[in-house]
A protein has these predicted regions:
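Blade/loop signatures of beta-propeller domains
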Residues: 355-379, 423-426
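Non-catalytic cap/lid and distal C-terminal segments of serine-dependent acyl enzymes
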Residues: 41-156, 160-357
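Beta-rich, blade/repeat-based domains predominating
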Residues: 370-406, 438-453, 457, 479-490, ...
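Structural signal for beta-propeller blades
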Residues: 413-415, 462-463, 500-501
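A short beta-strand motif characteristic of beta-propeller blades
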Residues: 432-438, 471-475
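Bacterial N-terminal signal peptides
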Residues: 22-35
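Blade-level signature of beta-propeller repeat domains, shared across WD40, Kelch, NHL, RCC1
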Residues: 486-525
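Short loop/turn segments immediately following beta-strands, especially the blade-tip
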Residues: 417-426, 505-511
């Protein structure tokens, strides 16, 4: 009577064992299939529509290419770099041409695309300036690295950009002491833009075409675009961001907006900053992560897209399933150029941000006024006296109503806040000092408005902090950095680049805090 149950248990056990083996085999198969599927997906889309702008140029269609080595930089001391200039066949030398700067050399098959788009009338007559990053070679000339300097310019359709170093244009191998690419490209400041403005473009202006025509390049920022891939892309964005007086149109391919040298900070800086007159085309791949140590490129580009959209920029964002290469960026390059130059010569204009602090501060203006909100101004003798008086104590300010006092220090990202033990009295003593206001750039001068918001003149413009010590808005300085400032009513006067400028705001400055009404609380949120 027991035997059948024993057999039954044995049969069930065997069946369970077979089932477990089957499940295990299916699981392994599923893992292999999933891995194969993911491997297949982590590549660029298989096909792209062939754009006519990639059609090979006939000899009769081509313009002129000028190559040279640039040395003796004062900004990037000791560096050497290769530069290519392309002059389209339509250029006559009689009037200034537009400009396209491409970082890491000739990427995206750019010369062919440029010439075809210019010939078809889809792009204005544009001189191409292709700039490699700098390297410093050993004086001894000993053989060392065998790859070419700035080999990002040689990147194929599926190659990574900006890897490599070490051969002169003559082909003689040299030992590289320093690669300057990351230092030049990944920095979040206007240094590379200044390098282009003060050193590269003046040098290009000395060149002539084979027919003797001078190279005339428009100084109008609306006639200038800049592009790059990877670190070159963030460099292109930074050049336009910090110097919209130089560049207004940006193409970014697989941009390195990650934590290399502060690029990860851009999304929240963009959200807080008064919009600039820029038009931006972003490209990236879902699987873009050159080195996860620094962050996720795809995630960073999505944050950039979100921030730029919030801040009201003219923006186009395109992606595929690829990784960190320029295959997709190359395929999109013709459309990116068409989109960036569409409507030319109409000016690129400022959009309207959804930042509520900016909306509260800025008056409604036409697009042209938003692009140039500051006007040069001269002061009356009385205004000059007020300006100089305000600048005698640039690092202290008392809030309206006399309830708190802000004290800043040169070079510090923190501003101390003190509370009054006898609020509203000029004879009060100040107590409870704490690091309270946190800045994005060190202060040059501080002042309150009548609503109790703290204004901070700084290198990145005027930071505006709320009652709780947070920067909520950043007003662009007329020349970038703002050294000094003064409110006269709702007229804000600043010194920027050694010149005086003014603009009107909806806010008014606090002039006599102990006689002014205590502002409405902003709560603790």
């Amino acid at each position: 009577m027991k035997q059948p149950s024993v057999k039954l248990r044995g049969g069930v056990a065997a069946m369970r064992l077979v089932a477990m083996r089957s499940v295990a085999m299916l699981s392994v198969a599923a893992v292999l299939l999933t891995a194969a599927h993911l491997g297949a997906q982590q590549v660029h889309n298989a096909k792209y529509p062939k754009d006519p702008a990639f059609a090979p140029l006939q000899k009769s269609d081509m313009g002129e290419t000028i190559n040279f080595t640039m040395e003796n930089s004062k900004i990037y001391v000791g560096t050497s770099r290769e530069i290519t200039v392309y002059v389209p066949k339509e250029y006559t030398g009689k009037e200034p041409a537009c400009l396209l700067v491409c970082l890491d050399g000739v990427l995206f098959n750019a010369i062919t695309v440029m010439q075809n788009l210019i010939s078809s009338g889809e792009m204005p007559v544009t001189i191409g300036l292709f700039v490699q990053p700098g390297v410093i070679y050993a004086r001894s000339g000993e053989a060392g690295s065998s790859s070419k300097a700035g080999s990002g310019s040689k990147a194929g359709s599926g190659s990574k950009v900006g890897s490599g170093a070490g051969e002169s244009c003559s082909g003689t191998q040299k030992r590289v002491q320093r690669y300057n690419r990351s230092n030049e490209f990944d920095r979040v400041d206007g240094t590379f833009a200044r390098f282009l403005e003060e050193e590269v473009l003046p040098l290009v202006a000395t060149l002539k075409c084979s027919g003797g025509q001078p190279l005339l390049i428009s100084s109008n920022p609306n006639n200038r675009a800049i592009t790059g891939a990877s670190s070159g892309a963030i460099c292109a964005f930074s050049a336009a961001w910090f110097r919209p007086d130089l560049f207004r149109r940006v193409y970014s391919s697989v941009g390195t907006f990650v934590a290399m040298r502060g690029g990860n900070q851009y999304p929240w800086i963009i959200r807080k900053t008064e919009p600039k007159p820029l038009r931006i085309y972003l490209q990236d791949g879902v699987n873009d992560a050159w080195n996860p140590l620094f962050g996720e490129w795809w995630e960073a580009n999505q944050l950039m897209e979100s921030a730029l959209d919030f801040a009201g920029y003219e923006l186009f964002f395109k992606w595929d399933r690829g990784g960190h290469s320029i295959k997709h960026g190359t395929a999109l390059f013709p459309d990116a150029m068409r989109w960036l130059w569409r409507g030319w010569p109409a000016a690129v204009e400022c959009g309207c941000s959804r930042n509520d602090m900016l909306q509260a501060l800025l008056p409604e203006q036409q697009a042209a006024q938003r692009s140039q909100p500051w006007q040069r101004c001269s002061l009356t003798a009385e205004e000059r006296a007020l300006f100089e008086e305000a600048c005698k104590s640039p690092m202290e300010a008392i809030s309206p109503g006399g309830w708190s006092k802000a004290v800043a220090q040169k070079g510090s990202m923190w501003i101390y806040s003190y509370t009054a033990n006898n609020p509203g009295s000029p004879d009060t003593e100040w107590e409870n000092g704490l690091e309270f206001y946190y800045l994005h750039s060190a202060p040059n001068q501080i002042a309150f408005d009548t609503e109790g918001n703290l204004y901070v003149a700084s290198e990145i413009g005027i930071q505006v902090c709320d009652h709780n010590g947070r920067v909520r808005a950043i007003l662009n300085g007329p020349k970038g950095s703002v050294e000094r400032m003064l409110f006269i009513g709702n007229r804000l006067i600043v010194e920027s680049g050694g010149e005086l400028f003014c603009r009107e705001l909806r806010a008014a400055g606090s002039r006599n805090p102990f006689k002014e009404q205590l502002p409405k609380s902003q709560g603790q949120g």
